[in-house]
């Protein structure tokens, strides 16, 4: 299985500043020109919400302050400017190889 290592495990960011979350895959998640890395946001008591698919594509209805980048094994989620409603846990997920796997999560606190 592909192991996804997220960092940091938690971070606290001031309102209006930038939050950066990294995800490193144990092997490439690229295939045929695309990177099959996705990012989700989860708030307590709610199902995960898809933010970014294939590394850099913004899901419909998601604010443009969320952006994703990377390829191969190294990926980044940026949130800028951070808003209070962004307090949540964020997960990377690869969909290149079965079984699809998730990172262990990054908890974002807004200061």
UniProtKB/Swiss-Prot annotation:
Chain spans, region Framework-3: 61-92
SMART domains registered for this protein in UniProt: IG (SM00409), IGv (SM00406)
A GO-annotated cellular component: immunoglobulin complex
Keyword terms, alphabetized: Adaptive immunity, Disulfide bond, Immunity, Immunoglobulin
Region (Framework-1): 1-23
InterPro entries registered for this protein in UniProt: Ig-like_dom, Ig-like_dom_sf, Ig-like_fold, Ig_sub, Ig_V-set, IgV_Light_Chain
Pfam families registered for this protein in UniProt: V-set
Record PROSITE patterns: IG_LIKE (PS50835)
Region (Framework-4): 102-111
Region (Framework-2): 39-53
Disulfide bridge partners, by residue number: 23-92
Spans annotated as Complementarity-determining-2: 54-60
Name of the protein: Ig kappa chain V-III region PC 6308
Organism: Mus musculus (Mouse)
């Amino acid at each position: 299985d592909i192991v996804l290592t997220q960092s940091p495990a938690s971070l606290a960011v001031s309102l209006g500043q930038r939050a950066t979350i990294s995800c490193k895959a144990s092997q490439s998640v690229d295939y045929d020109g695309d990177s099959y890395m996705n990012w989700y946001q989860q708030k307590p008591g709610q199902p995960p919400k898809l933010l970014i698919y294939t590394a850099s594509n913004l899901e419909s209805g998601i604010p443009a302050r969320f952006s994703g980048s990377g390829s191969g094994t190294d990926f980044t989620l940026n949130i800028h400017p951070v808003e209070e409603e962004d307090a949540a846990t964020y997960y990377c997920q690869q969909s290149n190889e079965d079984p699809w796997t998730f990172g262990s999560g990054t908890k974002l606190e807004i200061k």
